[in-house]
Regions:
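Cysteine-centered catalytic environments shared across enzyme families
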Residues: 1-197
């Protein structure tokens, strides 16, 4: 879909079929904010704007792919896994007491926090622009559309059969969208509740 949109706007110089090329061209043509609003699925990435000398960290809408970042001893570190940060010579892992408290209360450490001091996690649906003065601009490109009226019992006026058809259509469309890939696609079904639905 994004490739088609870019083609309609005149871009037709594709070198391959990768998602990475599509992401780069979309950002180059539309700018990062407009481009990521069109991205769906699970992703996190970091991109350097060589013209403006700006670094952007981006995380998918639901936060499925993590992305950690922070300044440690005059070095800016980022990674999709905390264990990779521990490999850097500048990083000495120190537990953040506030994050530990959140973990004990919630059994997880919610973004923007991480378990380590001076390391943050990009929030879902967020772009973080890293500035030269070591500050960050956070740009929310997507937020969960919560409509209170749609959550009330009286607002649902479909029959069971209509709801079944709607759900089947939604699941079919979502699965079809996820099947588009530049590599072979497979699925592992465990037999659990989520695989059986």
């Amino acid at each position: 879909k994004i490739r088609n949109d870019l083609g309609l706007e005149g871009y037709n110089s594709w070198r391959g079929h990768s998602d990475t090329e599509t992401i780069l061209v979309a950002i180059e043509c539309w700018g990062i904010e407009r481009a990521v609003k069109k991205f769906t699925g699970m992703f996190s990435f970091v991109i350097w704007d060589n013209y403006k000398k700006e670094l952007f960290l981006v995380r998918d809408r639901m936060g499925e792919k993590p992305l950690y970042y922070g300044w440690i001893n005059n070095v800016f570190l980022f990674s999709s896994e905390l264990k990779a940060l521990k490999k850097h010579n500048s990083f000495t892992p120190e537990i953040d007491k506030k994050s530990l408290g959140l973990y004990l209360k919630l059994l997880s450490v919610p973004a923007p926090y991480s378990i380590y001091k001076n390391i943050l996690k990009v929030e879902p649906g967020m772009i973080v622009k890293v500035k030269k003065d070591r500050t960050y601009d956070k740009i929310r490109y997507w937020d969960y559309p919560c409509q209170k009226e749609s959550l009330t019992i009286n607002s649902f006026n479909k029959s069971f059969q209509e709801a079944q058809i709607d759900l089947t259509d939604l699941l079919t469309n979502v699965v079809s969208e996820q099947m588009v890939a530049d590599v072979p696609v497979g699925a592992f079904l465990s037999g659990g509740v989520d695989s059986s639905s």
